[in-house]
Amino acid sequence: MAHINCTQATEFILVGLTDHQELKMPLFVLFLSIYLFTVVGNLGLILLIRADTSLNTPMYFFLSNLAFVDFCYSSVITPKMLGNFLYKQNVISFDACATQLGCFLTFMVSESLLLASMAYDRYVAICNPLLYMVVMTPGICIQLVAVPYSYSFLMALFHTILTFRLSYCHSNIVNHFYCDDMPLLRLTCSDTRFKQLWILACAGITFICSVLIVFVSYMFIIFAILRMSSAEGRRKAFSTCSSHMLAVTIFYGTLIFMYLQPSSSHSLDADKMASVFYTVIIPMLNPLIYSLRNKDVKDALKKVIINRNHAFIFLKLRK
């Protein structure tokens, strides 16, 4: 990798979503509202799953981990983006930029692999219901979560080290609202061919493998549903999988648009809009997708609300 003698950047300036001052405050209010909804939705879902014993199953174990990743995923990006709306020049240090990129990649890859683990869980539940609790033991569930976290951390660490070993001397102005690969690579004066091949290989292998696991799992699930004689059984099986199918389609579709396209066709403005969708909107949507379309979660939420109301009435009567 060729290096050019130059003054290395010690900080970066994030351009943000817009240069129009009149849009910044409305966008700040909008994204702050979305972020608060994301935090409440995902943390609330985790607490609900932990509090209700009827939700202590492998399916909801994976869902609570997905909610945790969504919360972290959004929290890595959104607070800094909100600051960009309030300050004229949003400066981020070299080390903070590296940390943000590393954390972002860790949680993005974790989400992709967790969705694949959840697809396997759905496959076992629909295709082998009698063996479900035998196959999906606590040990297997922990492995299906630990492997994505471990792989994601190691891949993100290596990826971040490669990115920040490059020389940044052309400019320190990042045309994005967070530290991401494509905008950073446009600033470097180093040879980026190896880095771009690494991005393509990692994104391709990781996401294609994840998509294949999901695709194969759902092919077996669809065949199993079609073989069911009971219409009620087919409806229940489909309702079990529909939320996950929707979440998978939204997440992978956005990532394919972002990363699995030639670098020459990348438009940073289009990338910004796609990035908003999968770093801000998807973490907000997932709790809604999995809650509003899930009878067990809705019943557990009603139970919590009723119990709290009863406790409140009891305390009022004691007074």
UniProtKB/Swiss-Prot annotation:
<keyword id="KW-0297">G-protein coupled receptor</keyword>
<feature type="transmembrane region" description="Helical; Name=1">
    <location>
        <begin position="29"/>
        <end position="49"/>
    </location>
</feature>
<dbReference type="GO" id="GO:0004930">
    <property type="term" value="F:G protein-coupled receptor activity"/>
</dbReference>
<feature type="topological domain" description="Extracellular">
    <location>
        <begin position="261"/>
        <end position="271"/>
    </location>
</feature>
<keyword id="KW-1133">Transmembrane helix</keyword>
<feature type="topological domain" description="Extracellular">
    <location>
        <begin position="1"/>
        <end position="28"/>
    </location>
</feature>
<dbReference type="GO" id="GO:0005886">
    <property type="term" value="C:plasma membrane"/>
</dbReference>
<feature type="topological domain" description="Cytoplasmic">
    <location>
        <begin position="226"/>
        <end position="239"/>
    </location>
</feature>
<dbReference type="InterPro" id="IPR000725">
    <property type="entry name" value="Olfact_rcpt"/>
</dbReference>
<keyword id="KW-0675">Receptor</keyword>
<feature type="disulfide bond">
    <location>
        <begin position="97"/>
        <end position="179"/>
    </location>
</feature>
<keyword id="KW-0716">Sensory transduction</keyword>
<comment type="function">
    <text>Odorant receptor.</text>
</comment>
<feature type="topological domain" description="Extracellular">
    <location>
        <begin position="78"/>
        <end position="97"/>
    </location>
</feature>
<feature type="glycosylation site" description="N-linked (GlcNAc...) asparagine">
    <location>
        <position position="5"/>
    </location>
</feature>
<keyword id="KW-1015">Disulfide bond</keyword>
<feature type="topological domain" description="Cytoplasmic">
    <location>
        <begin position="119"/>
        <end position="122"/>
    </location>
</feature>
<keyword id="KW-0472">Membrane</keyword>
<feature type="transmembrane region" description="Helical; Name=5">
    <location>
        <begin position="205"/>
        <end position="225"/>
    </location>
</feature>
<feature type="transmembrane region" description="Helical; Name=7">
    <location>
        <begin position="272"/>
        <end position="292"/>
    </location>
</feature>
<feature type="transmembrane region" description="Helical; Name=2">
    <location>
        <begin position="57"/>
        <end position="77"/>
    </location>
</feature>
<feature type="transmembrane region" description="Helical; Name=4">
    <location>
        <begin position="123"/>
        <end position="143"/>
    </location>
</feature>
<keyword id="KW-0807">Transducer</keyword>
<keyword id="KW-0552">Olfaction</keyword>
<feature type="transmembrane region" description="Helical; Name=6">
    <location>
        <begin position="240"/>
        <end position="260"/>
    </location>
</feature>
<dbReference type="InterPro" id="IPR000276">
    <property type="entry name" value="GPCR_Rhodpsn"/>
</dbReference>
<protein>
    <recommendedName>
        <fullName>Olfactory receptor 8U8</fullName>
    </recommendedName>
</protein>
<feature type="topological domain" description="Cytoplasmic">
    <location>
        <begin position="50"/>
        <end position="56"/>
    </location>
</feature>
<dbReference type="Pfam" id="PF13853">
    <property type="entry name" value="7tm_4"/>
</dbReference>
<comment type="similarity">
    <text>Belongs to the G-protein coupled receptor 1 family.</text>
</comment>
<keyword id="KW-0812">Transmembrane</keyword>
<feature type="topological domain" description="Cytoplasmic">
    <location>
        <begin position="293"/>
        <end position="319"/>
    </location>
</feature>
<keyword id="KW-0325">Glycoprotein</keyword>
<feature type="transmembrane region" description="Helical; Name=3">
    <location>
        <begin position="98"/>
        <end position="118"/>
    </location>
</feature>
<feature type="topological domain" description="Extracellular">
    <location>
        <begin position="144"/>
        <end position="204"/>
    </location>
</feature>
<keyword id="KW-1003">Cell membrane</keyword>
<dbReference type="GO" id="GO:0004984">
    <property type="term" value="F:olfactory receptor activity"/>
</dbReference>
<dbReference type="InterPro" id="IPR017452">
    <property type="entry name" value="GPCR_Rhodpsn_7TM"/>
</dbReference>
